[in-house]
Amino acid sequence: MDNSRPFELEKMQAELKEAGLDGWLFYDFRGLDPIAHSILRFASGKMGTRRWFFFVPAEGEPSKLVHAIETAALDHLPGSKTVYGTRQSLDAALQEILSGSSRVAMNYAADNPYVSRVDAGTVEKVRSKGVEVVTSGELIQIFESVLSPEQLESHRRAGAHIRGVVDEVFALVGDTLRAGRTITERDICDYANKSIREGGFENDHDPIVGVNEHAADPHFEVPAEDSAEVRPGDLLLFDVWARETKPGSIYADITWCAFIGSEPPEEMLKVFSVVRDSRKAACERAHEAFSSGEEIRGCDLDRVTRGVIAEAGYGEYFVHRTGHSLHECIHGNGAHLDDFETYDDRKLIPGTLFTVEPGIYMPDKRIGIRSEVDVYHTGQGAEVTGPPHQEELVRIEI
C-alpha cells in the first residue's frame, strides 16, 4: 500500500459526524490489522510487538495509547499520548480515552472477515467500558477504496495491458499448435508473467491458467513442472491481473475462456452463455442503480448473478462470490459482491472499483467457465473498464 499519503484527520472526523458515531477506535497487536496500518499511514516494515490503541473522536484531539517499550509506535500521528506498562494500566487508560463516548466504530464485523480484523477478546474489552462497538466497514471503504483520478488512470493502463496479454496468449497457443509443437499451462503462465513485467507492470501471483478439469478449479495453481498440455478439443481458462510498479497503482483483473478448435461442445457453449448473461445482468443492474442514485450493496449484485445462473439450472456449480474490491491490492478493502461466502452488506460507493466474475465449474464434465470484468462506479453510472469484453467463447483454430 502507498502509505506516503497524509493522514486525513479532518475528513475522518467529518465522516464520523455524518455516521452519528462518537469515534473510531483503531487497535493492533503484532500486525494483525493491515487495514489500520494503511489508514493510519504506517511505514512499511515497521516493527511492533505490543498492543496499541488510537482513538479518533468525532470532535477534538485524537488519543494514542502505547506500551512503555514501544513509546514511539504512533509518533507519526497527531494526538495526545498515554504510555502503559501493565495490563491494569492499559485498562484504566482505555477507560479514560473512551469516557464520554457511547458508540464507536472498530475494524470488526459479525459476518465479514475482510473487515473483521480486531479479535473478539479486544472487542469484549472495549464493550466492558460501557461502549457500543459497531462495524467500521463503511468507513473503511471511504478511506481505503475510493480512487484518485491518477489511480483510475493507472487502472486503465493496467487493464489495457492485460487485455493485450489475453490476445497474445491465445495467439501463442494457436501458433504453437498449428506448428505442431506442444504448449503447457506452465508455458502460458511464464509467457504471461514475462509480458506483464516487460510492459512495466507487476502481479502478486502467477495468473490462473487451467485446461479442462483445471479450468473447473476456480483457484487452480499451475505447477512449476509437469503441468498439463493444451491440446485440440480442450477448454482453456485464463485469469490475469496486474498493476503498474509505482506506489499507489491500482490493479486490473480479467478472465477469458477459449476452446481449442472450431466446434465447442453444445453444453460448453450453453454454460458460457449463462455465465456471460449473469455477468452482464450484474453490470446492468449496477449501472441502473448508480445512474439513478439508488443505494445498492455488494450482496445485492451477488444475488443478481446467482439468480441468473440458478434459473438456468447451474446454481450448485457457482461456488464462489461474484466479485471483489479492486485497489492497490488485488483483493481490496471495499465492498465485495458477496452474499454467498460472507455477507457483505456495504454500499457500493462512487469512486470505487470492483470485479464481476461469475463462474460455473463442473469438474466431472471437464468444464469450468468464468467471465470477469472490472467495474468503476463513476457517480453517474457503472463503467465496465478494459474493453473489448468477452461476448462469445473464443475459438482458437488449429
What would you call each of these model-derived segments?
Residues M1-I398:
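Active-site neighborhoods and metal-handling regions in enzymes and metal-associated proteins
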